[in-house]
């Protein structure tokens, strides 16, 4: 059963969502950036942010401890929204909760910069991290579009012959931009996302590239020899089957994957500061430490 707090938050989201759906891309970006700045204010005196001059990114570093681990964090936003402040928001939370250096990437967005811009930026960020940390000390974490991008990045890392990170953690990853497996019931249950809105964003991101291209929709890629994976998803979201199918395919290809499905939760519920979010963060901490701390 969902917590009282999550039920209240869900009600508020349901009331506000019709208005949010009316926002154009620019207003959506401004809203996400504002949320990121709010997270940063909450993290004051816990996390420091340092600009990275060579790539469009920032380091989020925990103030009260040293760390020899690194997280490459890829934010969500349907590939059309999110930005520097939004990335630093949840990236800062990861730095504080997982006690790690977090590289918060501000990757280029569609429609101004369609595929493969975001993937190219993710590759450069990972190469930058590899110059500072050994691969066994690096994890990739992504949510929503950033979760799908994280898996696309792994496929590209393998293609380039780079060392694989220690593990990957994703939250409600968008792994199939064709949206062929999103059911009508999934769309109705999700208070945050709509199938129509996602497909619109998918076409903006893909541009002239087919939606089932494995670097656009990693579910169609070669998922052999992937690092250990942890996936979080809610039962009440459009992308539920993306997570289930990705988990199943990882297992079929001989990889180790853990799938955590939270009842009555919606898209990227982990980011909402709920009791259910706390439980997910604790699972994330345990998984991250198992794979990066010697």
Give each language-model segment a name:
Residues 1-65, 293-294:
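A glycine/proline-hinged amphipathic helix-loop "lid/cap" segment
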Residues 15, 52-58, 62-294:
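Alpha/beta-hydrolase superfamily serine-hydrolase fold, recognizing
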